[in-house]
């Protein structure tokens, strides 16, 4: 299917952006309040007089007294200058002076008080401000005024300086301002500067000052999805120059700051040549787990999921989840393959499923109840309705389906899982009965060989891998409607064993492993369950409004996306739910153009430079 | 093209094995010699009497004297036993006793001599053997007899024991025998045992004794191509258990023994999970270069070539060089792609070039003067005659050609090179003139982008990468027949510079980088030249009998294979030459079914389990 696209802008297969925004983010506006004024009580006899303007008059009066050095009862000595002012005014305007004058301190009685920590000019500015509400903040004095205002607790002046600084932010001064905010724990200013640095990271990372950034700030900035980098290598090099700036002091901090560098997203060659060979990295054994995670990700792809495998917003790649084939209303079969990008809220159709573009609809292959999985960013699909042997893999870079070696045993309602960088095809239905056969694929030799068979023959079960073990959950066994058994395979012993059973017997279910739990959904369960391999225990995560038999579930953008399925009345469902494990919240993400069930759903990393012209007839027989 | 094959046995596209064996290995048989006897001199008067049997009679006589203790002039005291014998007999049979009795040593005069280092029973056996030529070697006494015979220099007895041991070799005793041979520096026995261990490695590596193997022997055994392992992982695990057996002593030897483990051939996942994570490996910084080589090989394939990237004989994979397309006699174009395996002396045709199987010959694409290179074991081909833009890649595991993104600038007589895990397309001819444009391919984004252009516009040049730099050699520049310029690109500076010029101006040439030199052949040079990037100097390697314009050259099995080309009379050549850098020898390897020139020639690692049924129509549009 020919897709045309402008350079740099993602266009949808068909316009959906509107529908995506629709029901989800209603903006609320607070009614704005006008400043108070003369308010009459209705019954006419009494008047609540609220003279908003009086405070200004009062203040002018105080200023005039100060100008005439009248009734002044304290002299603030700063450097060589002396400022006479009124204790009561200072106490009213500043908690610092309030504490000084109202508590039983010696200053309470002294006529002349020596003030440290501020220069005369800044004192002059602050006193003028106190008595006139006016002050001239300039690039030259803002830092001194802010520090003094913070010291004497002139909080409104502190905010004024902070917003002055926020406006004046530029690549050269932002780090300095950040340190200022840090030392005086001005949290809102700090947040503003941090998001400025995040947005303008590329211009800032080369500045000298950046190298003096405190470690926590650096750690926080590097964690952000919105960090404006097009290549993760820029992030790695920033961290390394930051450490190299003060090696003795900062080598021990390397694991902490490296934690937020998304090493798996680095170009594999760059990773080997620059990261692996970096002398500091080689001297620091604690970073080993981070290196191993990246090494395994380069070999296996999504089998390794962590906050470091999610592309950042401005990198030319995006984590997307796919809806592959399946069937829709009135049992029509779906040949389309759709990529959904929750971060950019876009939907894109890619190359149709193989053997689905014959003139005669009846000749088209029905990709239903097949199995699918991602290995090294390629989507493998196998088998399908009526005991198929076919195996194809989809390469999203070249947007093509490519056939690989047939399965030894044709099957459907089975599952595929990636474990230790190898694809496993597990169980399913061979047209006669449920089978326990398991096959693994060797990509170099392009051949399937048998692995240890299941303990219980099942079909329409859920399956996924988690920390070097493979889990097969529930499904329909021979001679029974459904089972609650959890079967677990350990490749190091090549043995299957039973783990804690599910809370319910269920089939037509799907599972994904995310962070340290396995999530299961579908069947007649009307709920999302989670299994903890560590504790070998199950728990209910959340109820669902409807049954979702044969729905899809895929981890993407640090959330779980549940797609389609069949409700209690066996109707196809078109909505996509989103479960946010951190916020523990279930939301309806969007509505698909049409309902779908018995489809495949996986996650891949998709290139986002632009859609180049892709010409049919692109692969030889 | 459907290829059928039995399980486990490679069958040729067409029977060729005969022709390969033909002209190359004539076996010679030495005439056998009969033992000497009575020889008459022709003229009848004198007879040269050579009584071969006399020595036996003499020996029996001496034995009888010994039995009767007659004329015995020395008593050898061994433990509590005494052996009286004749000095002259002992001296004649053993250099040890000759030295003892003939030199001015005290033993020369002593009647009774105490003999150390041998037990009575063994002495008895040796003396019987000396006087009767007979001895009974058994499993129980062979070690003691051999040690004594070696001590007393009964060399024929030593050999007899050695061959007894060689016959009796089994997985349990071979290591012991090897140590025996080692300590007594019995080189021939040592060699025999080493080759026994190499042939039966899998059974032996688990034996306890294996862990006591001396380091040099282990190092030697692991180096062998014939080491009987089907998976390189078996070699790695052997080395690690050998080191772990005496860690304190052997950790420092790890880099030395690991040197002969072919880490690049390990399954990439096994490499990350087991090798990278091994505690001893992580404690040993000196192995870093070996790890880096494997990491880069997993990313880039043949850009990294060393003794460790060549599969061993019994592993289910083989290094093969390919002959791709080109043209043959009377300008007919070749659509076939052939793999030649020098180790197994086999030739196999694989999937034909893309777009070459139309009914109408004229519609077929003419794959001539295109460029080709291997990246991550996939063969990339681009452009070709009449300014083509096509780019395809061949995956040998699934035996398919797959189209990828077009070149920005169509070209032919250009070259492709892999550098830093990236494919570069360089210069060439765009139908009008030679160009200096260089493009690089990003596999993830499937797009070509421009890189720094050549200094000199050239076509039909030679090009290769060597230790992180790219070299463009000779070729036809605009306005001149040929050039001798060597252009060098350094990606770290993104700059081209000129290096030492070739000894001759030449075009229609090809180059490969092998170990620390770049070899160039072809054009009208009638010779193979080599360039040393280290010394930036050229030298003549060897003359060739004919010109070989537009021939192919590929490194395989630690040798260089030069294929086809055009001779002085512009006739296509069918022979394949082999240059062995170690032996500095040029040999004619084999003759192809037909001559070929302007073809592509690269090296890949090919799976050797078996040819499974590969069905046409295997890739979706």
Curated annotation (Swiss-Prot), chains A, B:
Protein name: Kelch-like protein 6
Positions of Kelch repeats: 320-367, 378-421, 422-468, 470-516, 517-558, 560-606
Function: Involved in B-lymphocyte antigen receptor signaling and germinal center formation.
SUPFAM superfamilies for this protein: Kelch motif (SSF117281), POZ domain (SSF54695)
Gene: KLHL6
Record InterPro entries: BACK, BTB-kelch_protein, BTB/POZ_dom, BTB_POZ_KLHL6, Kelch-typ_b-propeller, Kelch_1, SKP1/BTB/POZ_sf
Domain BTB: 72-139
Tissues in which the protein is found: Found in germinal center B-cells.
Record-level Gene Ontology MF annotations: ubiquitin-like ligase-substrate adaptor activity
Residues of the BACK domain: 174-276
Domain of life, source organism: Eukaryota
A Gene Ontology BP annotation from the UniProt entry: proteasome-mediated ubiquitin-dependent protein catabolic process
């Amino acid at each position: 299917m020919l897709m045309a696209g402008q350079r740099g802008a993602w266009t949808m297969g068909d316009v959906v952006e509107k529908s995506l925004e629709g029901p989800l983010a209603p903006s609320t506006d607070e009614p704005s309040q006008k400043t108070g004024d003369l308010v009459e009580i209705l019954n006419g006899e009494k008047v609540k007089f609220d003279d908003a303007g009086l405070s200004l008059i009062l203040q002018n009066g105080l200023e005039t007294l100060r100008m005439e050095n009248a009734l002044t009862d304290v002299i603030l000595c700063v450097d060589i200058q002396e400022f006479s002012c009124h204790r009561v005014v200072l106490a009213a305007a500043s908690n610092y002076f309030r504490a000084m004058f109202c508590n039983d301190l010696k200053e309470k009685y002294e006529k002349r008080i020596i003030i440290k920590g501020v220069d005369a000019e800044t004192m002059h500015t602050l006193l003028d401000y106190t008595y006139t509400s006016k002050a001239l903040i300039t690039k030259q004095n803002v830092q001194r005024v802010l520090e003094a205002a913070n010291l004497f607790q002139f909080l409104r002046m502190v905010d004024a300086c902070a917003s002055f600084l926020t406006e004046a932010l530029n690549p050269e001064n932002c780090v300095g301002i950040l340190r200022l905010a840090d030392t005086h724990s001005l949290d809102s200013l700090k947040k503003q500067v941090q998001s400025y640095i995040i947005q303008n990271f590329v211009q800032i990372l080369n500045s000298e000052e950046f190298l003096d950034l405190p470690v926590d700030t650096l750690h926080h900035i590097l964690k952000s999805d919105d960090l404006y980098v097009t290549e993760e290598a820029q992030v790695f090099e920033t961290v390394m120059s930051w450490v190299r700036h003060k090696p003795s002091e900062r080598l021990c901090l390397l694991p902490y700051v490296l934690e937020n560098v998304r090493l798996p997203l680095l170009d594999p060659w760059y990773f080997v040549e620059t990261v692996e060979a970096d002398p500091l990295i080689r001297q620091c054994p604690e970073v080993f787990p981070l290196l191993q995670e990246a090494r395994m990700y380069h070999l296996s792809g999504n089998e390794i999921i962590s906050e470091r495998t999610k592309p950042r917003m401005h990198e030319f790649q995006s984590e997307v989840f796919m809806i592959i084939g399946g069937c829709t209303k009135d049992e029509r079969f779906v040949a389309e393959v759709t990529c959904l990008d929750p971060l950019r809220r876009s939907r894109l159709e890619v190359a149709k499923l193989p053997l689905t573009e014959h003139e005669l609809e009846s000749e088209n292959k029905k990709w239903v109840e097949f199995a699918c999985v991602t290995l090294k960013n390629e989507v493998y699909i196998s088998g399908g309705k009526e005991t198929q042997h076919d195996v194809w893999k989809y390469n999203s870079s070249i947007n093509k389906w490519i056939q690989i070696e047939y399965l030894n045993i044709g099957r459907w309602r089975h599952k595929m899982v990636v474990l230790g960088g190898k694809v496993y095809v597990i169980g399913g239905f061979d047209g006669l009965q449920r089978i326990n056969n398991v096959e693994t694929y060797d990509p170099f030799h392009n051949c399937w060989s048998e692995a240890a068979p299941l303990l219980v023959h099942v079909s329409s079960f859920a399956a996924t891998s988690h920390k070097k073990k493979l889990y097969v959950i529930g499904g329909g066994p021979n001679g029974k409607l459904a089972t609650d058994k959890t079967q677990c395979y350990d490749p190091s012993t090549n043995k299957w064993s039973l783990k804690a059973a599910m809370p319910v017997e269920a089939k037509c279910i799907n599972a994904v492993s995310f962070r340290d739990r396995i999530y299961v959904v579908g069947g007649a369960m009307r709920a999302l369950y989670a299994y903890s391999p560590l504790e070998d225990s199950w728990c209910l995560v959340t109820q669902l409004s409807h049954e979702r038999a044969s729905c899809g579930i895929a981890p993407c953008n640090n959330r779980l996306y549940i797609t389609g399925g069949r409700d209690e009345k066996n109707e196809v469902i078109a909505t996509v739910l989103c479960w946010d494990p951190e916020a523990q919240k279930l939301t309806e993400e969007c509505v698909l153009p049409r309902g779908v069930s018995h489809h495949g759903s996986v996650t891949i990393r998709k290139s986002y430079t632009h859609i180049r012209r892709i010409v049919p007839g692109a692969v030889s027989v």
